[in-house]
Amino acid sequence: MRELLDSEYDVIVIGAGPGGSMASYHSSINGAKTLLIDKSQEIGTPVRCAEAVPYLDEFGINPDPSFIRSKIDGGILVAPNGKKIIVKGGKTQGYVVERKIFDKHLAVRSANVGTKIAIKSRVVGLDYDGEKYTVIVNHLGQIYAIKAKIVIAADGVESSIAEMAGIKCKKKVTEICSCAEYEMTNVKLLDKNMMEFYFGDICPKGYVWIFPKGETANVGLGIIDSKKKAIDYLNEFLEHPLLEGRLDNATPIEFKCGGAPVGGPIEKTVADNFMVVGDAAGQISPISGGGIYLSLSCGSIAGKVAGEAIKSNNCSEDYLVEYENRWKEKYYKLLMDELKYKKVLQKFSEKELNALADAMDERLEEIDVAKIAFRAVKRAPSLLKYFKDII
């Protein structure tokens, strides 16, 4: 480990979540000498999310049985009045995984193409001389100074690394979704391959989820700016009449909590010799709070651009901005549209949520916001005040 931390690297990636591991993987396969640093003593812990991941083929990741717990075909949206909307396409939409194993799988995949990995290593400072960064690392009480031509910050919602580099990424409290979740056994699912989502006063400005996970299920929720704690809402939901007793015999085997930055992406994700990816960059769905897909994709882009920059011997912001251009071209409009839709949905009363559900077909292949908004206003004109900028 000492030799690892005493070396100099082309690229240092900080944070071994999905975004960081994908960035280091693509940096390494593009020829850059890469170090992946994580503060945890075990990659993949603690788990802080509902563990749903997208269809993985586009990332070249084999859906290994070691981490796949359930295949997901779609979702069931449940309105406050109990009406269910089934959203189901024609193929597998993704998976619920064991994140502890999934994250390790991604890190091992990166190591197999040359990435070096340092665990139990906390970054406590950054120094920049105009050409390279010196990353100051505390590993088991020992301080190391490691040089890198490029630093990629993938250190999650609580990111401090980007701030050290002068990039503003601190999130407002009102932009952080507080999440609490039980993994439970003996849950009676509506469908073993469908995710369930519940809306209304049971979870203000958020939603409750039940995700099938093999022999267990993840039951959790995310709330924003609430007077009560997420865990209090979750415990109340476990006895909610909408569940019709489906959790009466369920019991928790694990508790997880965390936060998701749902206020949209940060304004700037690059600087000279520096990039930001994943939750640290706000690359997360403002509506669902899901960020694994975006982290995998944006991490891949960052790693590729880092490798190209090293080959070109140009690590300036003018070169690295290609990362920002590529990810924004793919996702920026989508994220900003979702932010707009989220602000609309958060204003809905339970009565209005029921009216919206009544305006939707009971079976959908996908969510078309404009079409749903048009039908909702047609059936319930009072909703026009919310949807006038959408239809």
UniProtKB/Swiss-Prot annotation:
Pathway: Membrane lipid metabolism; glycerophospholipid metabolism. The keyword Ion transport does not apply. It catalyses: a 2,3-bis-O-phytanyl-sn-glycerol 1-phospholipid + 8 A = a 2,3-bis-O-(geranylgeranyl)-sn-glycerol 1-phospholipid + 8 AH2; 2,3-bis-O-(phytanyl)-sn-glycerol 1-phosphate + 8 A = 2,3-bis-O-(geranylgeranyl)-sn-glycerol 1-phosphate + 8 AH2; CDP-2,3-bis-O-(geranylgeranyl)-sn-glycerol + 8 AH2 = CDP-2,3-bis-O-(phytanyl)-sn-glycerol + 8 A; archaetidylserine + 8 AH2 = 2,3-bis-O-phytanyl-sn-glycero-3-phospho-L-serine + 8 A. It is an enzyme of class 1 (oxidoreductase). Binds 1 FAD per subunit. Its cofactor is FAD. Its EC number is 1.3.-.-. Pfam families: FAD_binding_3 (PF01494), GGR_cat (PF22578). GO terms for biological process: glycerophospholipid biosynthetic process; membrane lipid biosynthetic process. Belongs to the geranylgeranyl reductase family. DGGGPL reductase subfamily. NCBIfam families: GG-red-SF. PANTHER family: DIGERANYLGERANYLGLYCEROPHOSPHOLIPID REDUCTASE, GERANYLGERANYL DIPHOSPHATE REDUCTASE. Is involved in the reduction of 2,3-digeranylgeranylglycerophospholipids (unsaturated archaeols) into 2,3-diphytanylglycerophospholipids (saturated archaeols) in the biosynthesis of archaeal membrane lipids. Catalyzes the formation of archaetidic acid (2,3-di-O-phytanyl-sn-glyceryl phosphate) from 2,3-di-O-geranylgeranylglyceryl phosphate (DGGGP) via the hydrogenation of each double bond of the isoprenoid chains. Reduction reaction proceeds via syn addition of hydrogen for double bonds. This is Digeranylgeranylglycerophospholipid reductase. It comes from Methanococcus aeolicus (strain ATCC BAA-1280 / DSM 17508 / OCM 812 / Nankai-3).
